[in-house]
Amino acid sequence: MPICPLGKVIVFPPVSLAMEDGLLAVGGDLSPYRLLEAYRQGIFPWYSPGEPILWWAPQPRFVLFPDEILLSRSMRQILRKKHFQVTLDRNFDAVIHACATIGRPAQEGTWITEEMQEAYSILHELGYAHSVEVWRDRGLIGGLYGVSLGGCFFGESMFSRESNASKAALIFLSSLLKILRFTLIDCQVYTSHLALLGARFIPRETFTALIRKSLRRPTLRGNWSTHPETADKLPGHEF
């Protein structure tokens, strides 16, 4: 099956036409409208510097259900000691820049180009992209970012400058999304780091069906640290 080239019109082929490795389409742009339409269909961009924009819809899909997150005994002990302070949407640009320069566990190099950073910063300004920051002594030591639509959070990347900082970010996010009754966190592709925290594969058809169902609820747009639907539901800020 040939890879579908994208033009100026914001339309994607059915995800069922993706190649065996999940590659679905090539080209287009990273405008907010195209990115949001991609996420609504279970598609995400992922490409290396110097490559055209590549769009993916893997089969199966790696996801984390907020009520299925796993905490090891050692991680529980770390969280009880309150080594970290965690915030939401306080410094999105710093988080995505750190993800671009540090990368996430089990990921070789980085794929977050300057073009990608600019595109997701615009989504953040529009209230769709969000960050979780993990601090120690006012220093940013970990975090993650992604896109929220309906009842789904589409995770993009995470980073750690200290052990367990990115885990703390994901645990914090999962706790919040469980309170908000979100359906799932999209982890896109397998990593052992996320598998240890409870992420698992589901069929692509199940994934897209869950997205469609979750989109029936309103999207929580805006800064989540002050949004009326999230600010009063935040779990403890100190881990």
From Swiss-Prot:
UniProt keyword Transferase, yes or no: yes
GO CC term (a single one): cytoplasm
Subcellular location per the Swiss-Prot or TrEMBL entry: Cytoplasm
Gene: aat
UniProt cross-references to Gene3D superfamilies, sorted A to Z: Leucyl/phenylalanyl-tRNA-protein transferase, C-terminal domain (3.40.630.70), Leucyl/phenylalanyl-tRNA-protein transferase, N-terminal domain (3.30.70.3550)
Enzyme class per UniProt: transferase
Keywords assigned by UniProt, alphabetized: Acyltransferase, Cytoplasm, Transferase
Catalytic activity: N-terminal L-lysyl-[protein] + L-leucyl-tRNA(Leu) = N-terminal L-leucyl-L-lysyl-[protein] + tRNA(Leu) + H(+); N-terminal L-arginyl-[protein] + L-leucyl-tRNA(Leu) = N-terminal L-leucyl-L-arginyl-[protein] + tRNA(Leu) + H(+); L-phenylalanyl-tRNA(Phe) + an N-terminal L-alpha-aminoacyl-[protein] = an N-terminal L-phenylalanyl-L-alpha-aminoacyl-[protein] + tRNA(Phe)
Protein name as it appears in the record: Leucyl/phenylalanyl-tRNA--protein transferase
Source organism per UniProt: Syntrophus aciditrophicus (strain SB)
Function according to Swiss-Prot or TrEMBL: Functions in the N-end rule pathway of protein degradation where it conjugates Leu, Phe and, less efficiently, Met from aminoacyl-tRNAs to the N-termini of proteins containing an N-terminal arginine or lysine.
Family: Belongs to the L/F-transferase family.
